[in-house]
Amino acid sequence: MEIGQYQPNLEGDGLRIGIVQSRFNEPVCNGLADACVEELERLGVAGEDVLLVSVPGALEIPLALQKLAESGQFDALIALGAVIRGETYHFELVSNESGAGITRIALDFNVPIANAVLTTENDEQAVARMTEKGRDAARVAVEMANLTMALDQLGDDDEDEEEDEDDEEERA
């Protein structure tokens, strides 16, 4: 049996990407953003097609993502942040709630969101991961933007066939 398959597409030319970056743990978040923007450029996304907004912390990321999603101007969004474990339960709360909020926005607005909000035990782990995770976020955003656009086209083929059948019936 032969099955259809979609090959990953990392061509960023023409894609519009919105990035929301937390300022808490700023050196790590700046490292994430630098790596992400550099990778977007390498993938062909034009600088004028990228909007970067910053928010105070990880819990504010979902609301900013929601506003960007509501605008309808972006093919994909990226969440950048760093939640580093401290001595209280706050780490779990921030990690869980920001992650759930990001997922909800993606599903509610049918827009891909690359989640690169790091959750680490200490600063060293965050610094060690920031560059590669920033790059990963760019690749995920571009690939998922292209995938969702390709999947959106699946329904268009059926509509085109129905229109062709309707046109033939009208001519008969």
Curated annotation (Swiss-Prot):
Keyword vocabulary terms for this entry: Riboflavin biosynthesis, Transferase
Active site: H90 (proton donor)
EC code(s) of this entry: 2.5.1.78
Enzyme class: transferase
GO cellular component: cytosol; riboflavin synthase complex
Function: Catalyzes the formation of 6,7-dimethyl-8-ribityllumazine by condensation of 5-amino-6-(D-ribitylamino)uracil with 3,4-dihydroxy-2-butanone 4-phosphate. This is the penultimate step in the biosynthesis of riboflavin.
Official protein name in the record: 6,7-dimethyl-8-ribityllumazine synthase
Protein species of origin: Burkholderia multivorans (strain ATCC 17616 / 249)
Gene that this sequence comes from: ribH
